[in-house]
């Protein structure tokens, strides 16, 4: 039974080990602590999986005191990791029990794998002893947890706890815990041979993402030593690898993440591929080694039975398939053995390391992929492409930076004005969605929007039709669906207009569909299509996310998609649509899978999920998506299908006998930033050019990657220029304009005529000093976050910047000629309300001279490259300074969730009182600074206008004598920062700052302390109010307007009553 939840997220250090904290840790100890810290995040994620997917009893709860429910992607990824390790151990234990078995978990962390297996199947474990091995420090903590967990000791039976100085910390009949650094192999070997292992035994080594944190030499030593510990040894290692090189967007994001954590991956560089990993083991004394990606294992019915895969969807709705595949394709499970004659399955090189360039016909030298990444670009994925006319297209809805969006990003090639409101869906009418389709059905650009979803459990049934540039609701689908596929077809003699054929998809309850429907522009709505297959073959399996394309008006092809069992289907069909004599619709399908396999080299990279298909004069261009068993390789990202040959086979009822598949890839000479063609859209902008837009993915827990810019595929011989660029984001936002138009003219005039007169307050010196603390662990800082009170963290290591960043050093390092934008104030107090300052562009050297001479100037750095789009980032904007500044390890949550890190340099000038929605830490580097802070509860008394975040009050109106404004009903707090201090400012605490002497230099790091709820869209400064407040203000406008039909006194009466009710609710 699990203990009650505690405030801490993961285990705190044992008391016996806390004394070690007072000593200054060595470099190796710091490195070990960073590696052990990765275990904390891992077990929290595994606990999330356990809560949802595992039956009672639960075991991670004894090590994770405060559970968190992770996102479905994280849950499924960790479920697969856990299943891979558990299944590997089960297979080992099922082998003939002619000798004792030992499972040695190298770098076990707090993973309770032995307890899970012993509890689930005691008889299977009867001949097995589990041995957990990790750092001494970690195993002391694990021992302390077991002492307190009666449920765990009852499973082990006859548990003995060793003294802290002993290598064997815990011993029972089937479980041993050993504290030993894996780099100390002499000690580990001695302990295992003398105290744990008998002379004859079978040993299975486990290493789940543990050896990769060691330097390569030390990790290789472990692999080699393990092969000699027993004459009957096996090794199962689960780690990251580069299936398509380190430049793949997922790989690059993953590596950057671990680098930021201070726990970089090492072995991956020495052994990047599966074949390299197999060689690593065979050269270290292992007789056989076989590696497979987790994505490959996911599709293996023997390793993950189909019934088990499908059961996961009944527990938690899931639709992050592309992102799951990317994760699973970058992790491998390798099984090695010292037994002679061990048989492995097909080598890794044959299943996952061979790129299509060695298998399929390539035409990469015939095409160019031209990026345009220099101009602003939208960020959305899983939207739908909307044709907008000549040289104009849009991406409608989909997933934006933080949530679903209902508007349209518009792209064009010229600077001509466009009537976006007429051509693109209105966010006022059509709700936000993703995984929907928009299909043109006429030469005039008329199109049909179909279905989609909000969440995977909420499919949409509506349709919308654009005719003559007007969008109107259409006939609802017979059944709501998303991830369906759609294409234009034309039946009858009128070729200028047509119909839309849709197939497959998924419903709200998770049912995968196999139905064909036809929508016709004749007012009749949807018609079902009867399916007939040639040669009495079975009909295609139900699927979603498939590729459906027309070759001409009534013939086309279908392939790929994911079936009901959660794997990508590897079939290929051609189809012919026709009308029977009675007017009914019929679809004739031919299974071309067998013939295509026989003639098409590289067929394994053709089955796709989430790919796009565009028709060109060259053939059908297939781009992106995911494929079975491995990641889509660089030279297989874009494929070309011979549509002429396909059409000839369909019309003549013949099987395929000549190759139709060739690869284009990302261009043989391509050297730019690689796009991630997932969740993207594509469009044939001419007969031989295809434009790729949008896309990106959540790269597991490592961060989000967005494909930047526009990408145009064209033949090599063309003199093409990619000048497609984003016109504007969120083109459909008329709500504010309409609201403004509805304000009476008199009200506008009255508001404009008001003159701001600052109120004079009495003075006071009574302030509450902010507490000073030292923070030595992440747990201590987490407690500070939970307390939500400002503190000054002193004696922290923020790098050599506190000594180095003199005026001369900064000018020389940043560059005297570097252009910066500064606030130049008219007085010593800047006011955001009266704007008594101006923005000036000048060189950094000039600014530093002037500010050190007493100039009333203030620099708050902004993004150097895209100041209107990206938040400030010290490392990116001032790379020459980045190595001088760092946050202490205890504040790693700030680093992991950082939003921005502006550099602040100020002279004798005071910033206005304001609040920030995000939490932040202000690191004082040079000079001293005085800040006055007010708790969020004081905001009604601080003259902060509705919808604004800045106050109109000058708190330092009597700064000369150290007094501040005496504002009734407020509780001012004071922070006096000196060099090296870190001030933690919780969200919504209003604050203002003034230097107390010479020039002040500081770095602010804003970070997200909420998992959701921030404002939608761009937030460069991190101070936009939360989404609920912004929406609430809009709702308030509607509420006030609803009383417009009443006499003013009655409206006021009821509005005040509502205000009282709202205040009562807020104060509960």
Swiss-Prot record:
S-adenosyl-L-methionine binds at residues 81, 107, 134, 181-182, 208. Pathway: tRNA modification; wybutosine-tRNA(Phe) biosynthesis. GO terms for biological process: tRNA methylation; wybutosine biosynthetic process. Its EC number is 2.1.1.290, 2.3.1.231. Signal peptide: none annotated. Residues 876-1024 form the JmjC domain. GO terms for molecular function: tRNA methyltransferase activity. The keyword NADP does not apply. Pfam families: Cupin_8, Kelch_3, LCM. It catalyses: 7-[(3S)-3-amino-3-carboxypropyl]wyosine(37) in tRNA(Phe) + S-adenosyl-L-methionine = 7-[(3S)-(3-amino-3-methoxycarbonyl)propyl]wyosine(37) in tRNA(Phe) + S-adenosyl-L-homocysteine; 7-[(3S)-(3-amino-3-methoxycarbonyl)propyl]wyosine(37) in tRNA(Phe) + S-adenosyl-L-methionine + CO2 = wybutosine(37) in tRNA(Phe) + S-adenosyl-L-homocysteine + 2 H(+). Keywords: Methyltransferase, S-adenosyl-L-methionine, Transferase, tRNA processing. InterPro entries: Cupin_8, JmjC_dom, Kelch-typ_b-propeller, Ppm1/Ppm2/Tcmp, SAM-dependent_MTases_sf. Belongs to the methyltransferase superfamily. LCMT family. This is tRNA wybutosine-synthesizing protein 4. It comes from Emericella nidulans (strain FGSC A4 / ATCC 38163 / CBS 112.46 / NRRL 194 / M139) (Aspergillus nidulans).
């Amino acid at each position: 039974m699990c203990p009650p939840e505690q405030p801490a997220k993961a285990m705190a250090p044992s008391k016996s080990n806390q004394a070690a904290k007072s000593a200054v840790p060595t470099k190796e100890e710091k490195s070990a602590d960073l590696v052990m810290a990765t275990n904390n995040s891992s077990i929290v994620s595994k606990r999330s999986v356990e809560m949802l997917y595992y039956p009672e009893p639960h075991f991670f709860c004894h090590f994770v005191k405060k559970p968190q429910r992770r996102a479905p992607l994280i849950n499924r990824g960790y479920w697969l990791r856990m299943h891979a390790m558990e299944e590997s151990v089960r297979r080992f234990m099922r082998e003939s029990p002619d000798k004792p078995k030992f499972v040695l978990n190298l770098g076990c962390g707090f993973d309770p794998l032995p307890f899970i297996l012993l509890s689930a199947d005691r008889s299977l474990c009867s001949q097995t002893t589990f041995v957990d091995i990790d750092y001494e420090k970690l195993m002391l903590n694990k021992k302390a947890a077991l002492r307190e967990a009666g449920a765990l000791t009852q499973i082990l039976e006859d548990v003995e706890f060793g003294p802290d100085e002993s290598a064997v910390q815990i011993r029972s009949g089937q479980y041993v815990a050993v504290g030993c650094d894996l780099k100390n192999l002499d000690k580990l070997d001695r302990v295992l041979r003398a105290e744990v292992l008998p002379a004859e035994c079978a040993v299975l080594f486990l290493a789940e993402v543990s050896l990769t944190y060691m330097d390569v030499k030390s990790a290789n030593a472990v692999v080699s030593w393990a092969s000699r510990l027993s004459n009957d040894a096996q090794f199962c290692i689960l780690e990251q690898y580069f299936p398509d090189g380190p430049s793949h967007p997922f790989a690059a994001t993953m590596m950057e993440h671990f680098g930021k954590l201070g726990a970089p991956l090492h072995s991956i560089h020495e052994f990047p591929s599966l074949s390299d990993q197999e060689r690593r083991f065979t050269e270290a004394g292992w007789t056989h080694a076989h590696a497979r990606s987790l994505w490959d294992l996911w599709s293996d019915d023997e390793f993950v039975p189909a019934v088990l895969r499908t059961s996961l969807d009944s527990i938690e709705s899931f639709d992050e398939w592309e992102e799951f595949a990317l994760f699973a394709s970058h992790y491998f499970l390798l099984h090695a053995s010292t037994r002679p004659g061990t048989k492995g399955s097909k080598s890794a090189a044959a299943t996952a390391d061979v790129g299509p360039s060695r298998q399929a016909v390539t035409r990469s030298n015939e095409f160019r992929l031209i990026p345009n990444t220099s101009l602003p670009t939208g960020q959305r994925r899983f939207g739908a492409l909307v044709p907008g006319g000549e040289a104009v297209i849009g991406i409608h809805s989909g997933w934006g930076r933080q949530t679903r969006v209902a508007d349209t990003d518009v792209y064009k090639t010229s600077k001509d004005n466009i009537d976006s409101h007429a051509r693109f869906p209105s966010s006022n009418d059509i709700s936000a969605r993703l995984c929907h389709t928009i299909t043109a059905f006429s030469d005039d650009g008329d199109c049909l929007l179909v279905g989609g979803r909000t969440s995977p459990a909420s499919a949409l049934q509506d349709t919308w039709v654009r005719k003559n540039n007007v969008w109107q609701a259409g006939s609802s689908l017979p059944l709501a669906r998303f991830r369906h596929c759609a294409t234009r077809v034309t039946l009858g003699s009128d070729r200028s207009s047509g119909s839309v054929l849709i197939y497959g998809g998924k419903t709200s309850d998770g049912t995968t569909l196999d139905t064909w429907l036809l929508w016709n522009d004749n007012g009749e709505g949807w018609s079902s299509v009867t399916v007939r297959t040639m040669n009495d073959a079975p009909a295609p399996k139900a699927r979603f996310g498939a590729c459906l394309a027309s070759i001409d008006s009534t013939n086309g092809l279908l392939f790929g998609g994911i079936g009901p069992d959660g794997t990508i289907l590897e079939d290929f069909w051609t189809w012919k649509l026709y009308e029977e004599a009675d007017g009914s619709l019929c679809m004739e399908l031919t299974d071309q899978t067998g013939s295509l396999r026989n003639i098409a080299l590289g067929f394994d990279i053709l089955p796709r999920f989430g790919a796009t298909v565009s028709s060109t004069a060259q053939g059908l261009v297939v781009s992106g998506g995911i494929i079975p068993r491995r990641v889509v390789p660089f030279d297989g990202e874009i494929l070309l299908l011979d549509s002429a040959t396909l059409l000839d086979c369909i019309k003549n009822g013949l099987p395929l006998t000549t190759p139709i598949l060739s690869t284009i890839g990302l261009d043989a000479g391509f050297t730019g930033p690689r796009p991630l063609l997932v969740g993207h859209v594509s469009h044939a902008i001419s007969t031989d050019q295809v434009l790729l837009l949008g896309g990106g993915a959540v790269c597991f827990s490592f961060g989000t990657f967005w494909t930047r810019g526009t990408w145009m595929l064209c033949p090599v011989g063309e003199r093409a220029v990619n000048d497609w660029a984003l016109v504007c984001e969120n083109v459909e936002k008329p709500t504010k304009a309409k609201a403004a138009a509805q304000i009476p003219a008199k009200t506008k005039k009255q508001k404009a005529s008001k003159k701001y007169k600052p109120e004079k307050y009495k003075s006071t010196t009574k302030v509450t000093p902010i507490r000073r603390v030292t923070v030595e662990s992440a747990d201590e800082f987490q407690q500070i976050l939970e307390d939500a009170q400002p503190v000054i963290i002193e004696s922290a290591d923020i790098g050599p910047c506190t000594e180095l960043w003199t005026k001369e050093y900064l000018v020389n390092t940043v560059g005297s000629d570097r252009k910066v934008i500064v606030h130049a104030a008219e007085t010593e107090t800047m006011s955001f309300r009266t704007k008594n300052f101006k923005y000036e562009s000048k060189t950094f050297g000039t600014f530093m001279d002037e500010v050190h001479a007493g100039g009333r100037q203030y620099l708050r750095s902004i993004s150097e490259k895209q100041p209107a789009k990206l938040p400030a980032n010290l490392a990116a904007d001032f790379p020459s300074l980045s190595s001088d500044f760092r946050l202490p390890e205890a504040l790693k949550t700030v680093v992991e969730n950082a939003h921005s890190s502006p550099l602040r340099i100020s002279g004798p000038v005071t910033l206005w009182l304001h609040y920030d929605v995000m939490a932040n830490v202000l690191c004082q580097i040079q000079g001293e600074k005085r800040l006055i802070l007010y708790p969020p509860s004081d905001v009604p008394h601080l003259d902060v206008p509705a919808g604004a975040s800045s106050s109109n009050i000058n708190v330092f109106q009597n700064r000369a004598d150290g007094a501040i404004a005496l504002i009734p009903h407020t509780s001012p707090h004071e922070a006096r920062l000196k060099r090296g201090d870190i001030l933690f400012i919780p969200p919504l605490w209003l604050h203002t700052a003034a230097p107390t002497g010479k020039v002040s230099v500081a770095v602010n790091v804003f970070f997200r302390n909420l998992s959701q709820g921030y404002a939608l869209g761009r937030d460069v400064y991190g101070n936009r109010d939360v989404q609920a407040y912004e929406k609430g203000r809009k709702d308030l406008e509607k509420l006030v307007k609803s009383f417009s039909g009443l006499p003013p006194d009655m409206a006021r009466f009821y509005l005040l009553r509502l205000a009282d009710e709202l205040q009562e609710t807020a104060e509960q």
